[in-house]
Every structure is written in C-alpha cells, then in structure tokens.
Amino acid sequence: MTKSQGFQFKQFFIAHDKCAMKVNTDGILLGAIADIRHKRQILDLGTGTGLVAIMLAQRTDENTQISALELEPNAYRQAVENCRNSAFSDRLQVYQGDVLDYHFHQKFDLIVSNPPYFSESLASRSYERDLARAATQSHLDWLLQAKKWLAEQGEISFILPFEAAEKLVEQSRTSCLFCTKICKIITKQGQAAKRMIVSFSAQNVPLEEQELVIYDADNQYTEAFKQLTKAFYLNM
C-alpha cells in the first residue's frame, strides 16, 4: 500500500484511506505515553483509525482488554478493519456511537482520547472531517462522560492543543477530578509547547509534570523521542 493508504509500524499496519483523520504524531504520542501500569480494562474514545487502541494492545499483555468507540461510520469501519488485521485482534473491540450518548456497562482502568479540537468556525471541506475535528461538544463534556466509566483507581488521559489542555485543567477543578499528570509536547528544541497530554483521576495525588521534545536544534529526533517510539516506528 502507498503512504496515502496507510502507515506501517513494526508490529501492525494502520490503513487510513477511508478515515478523514490520518495517522498523526498526536495519536502516536498518546499511544506511547499513556500509563498502562496495572490497567486491565482500557477505553479509547474517538478512536479514528484505531491507532491508539492498537498501540496500547501492543504495550500490554494478554490480560488487558481494549475497547474503542467511534462515531463516524467510515472511521468506525476502518478501525474495525485495522483491529481485526492486527496481531492483537482477540483483545480489541470497536463500538460505534457518540461519546455522550453511549452506554458502557463496565468500568475502565484507563480511558484515553485524542479528541476533536477544531472550533465550529474552522469549517473544513468534508462532512467527515468536520465530524472528526469540529468540537461541537466540549472537551469538558468528554471528560465528564469518561468520568462515568472510570474505575475508582482509574486514569483519564487526553492529548490536546496546549491552550485547550490548560482550559480543561482549569474546568476540571469543579468536576471532582484531579489533574495528576502533565506532559508538555515541544515540537522543536527552543520552541514553546504546542500540545499537552493531561491525565485526570478521582484520586488526589501529587501532580507529575514532564516535557518531551520531538526534534533537537538540528531537526533530528531527540533521544527521548526515539526511546519512546522505537517499539513502533520501523526505522527508529
């Protein structure tokens, strides 16, 4: 397949020719950074191609089950295809539905999402892309819904543009959730952070903060980024 049809990782292939949102660095970072320790039930909200769900399946053992939820029909079918074709298919289940309307009858130890972040004013060229990125529902809506499905000791992790993440952290203070981890994503050494992975829990534990720089001053991948992604990227 060509790059426009999909992306080859070390242990799986992600087709994205039917999905408005393609394989991107945000999803790869979330899939590589999310804390999987002691997590047996994992949920990926707005899974798109299924990339993050499959990455988490690779990182966990046979005792961990991963569920994924996607609204847009083409993306849902693509995620089903990608999960079915992966070596982890027996631990992956994709559901179709709206995050705010869906009903899961179980609790999850880890809930992750690379959610919509474009505002309604940033109209795009296709209905599917609007559906994938126009945030007609707020990030707080998604966070509060995720809270309903969260196990007592569980964790929610979102990757968002920096300003949106800061806003969500502020909003979360009235939701009985605590921000437990912040990872600032810096594209190039010396630049300001443009993305952030923020994690929340019902447990009031000390905040962990870190930074990840993707490229050094010479436009080469940093050692930290290479170590983080070497289990996934073919040439890392």
Swiss-Prot record:
EC number assigned by the record: 2.1.1.223
CDD domains noted in UniProt: AdoMet_MTases (cd02440)
Reaction catalysis annotation: adenosine(37) in tRNA1(Val) + S-adenosyl-L-methionine = N(6)-methyladenosine(37) in tRNA1(Val) + S-adenosyl-L-homocysteine + H(+)
Highest taxon above the source species: Bacteria
GO molecular function annotation: nucleic acid binding; tRNA (adenine-N6)-methyltransferase activity
GO-annotated cellular components: cytoplasm
Keyword line: Cytoplasm, Methyltransferase, S-adenosyl-L-methionine, Transferase, tRNA processing
SUPFAM superfamilies: S-adenosyl-L-methionine-dependent methyltransferases
A Pfam family of this chain: MTS
PROSITE patterns reported for this sequence: N6_MTASE (PS00092)
Gene3D superfamilies hit by this protein: Vaccinia Virus protein VP39 (3.40.50.150)
Location of this chain's protein in the cell: Cytoplasm
BP GO terms, sorted: methylation; tRNA processing
Family note: Belongs to the methyltransferase superfamily. tRNA (adenine-N(6)-)-methyltransferase family.
Function text: Specifically methylates the adenine in position 37 of tRNA(1)(Val) (anticodon cmo5UAC).
Stated name of the protein: tRNA1(Val) (adenine(37)-N6)-methyltransferase
Lineage of producing organism: Bacteria, Pseudomonadati, Pseudomonadota, Gammaproteobacteria, Pasteurellales
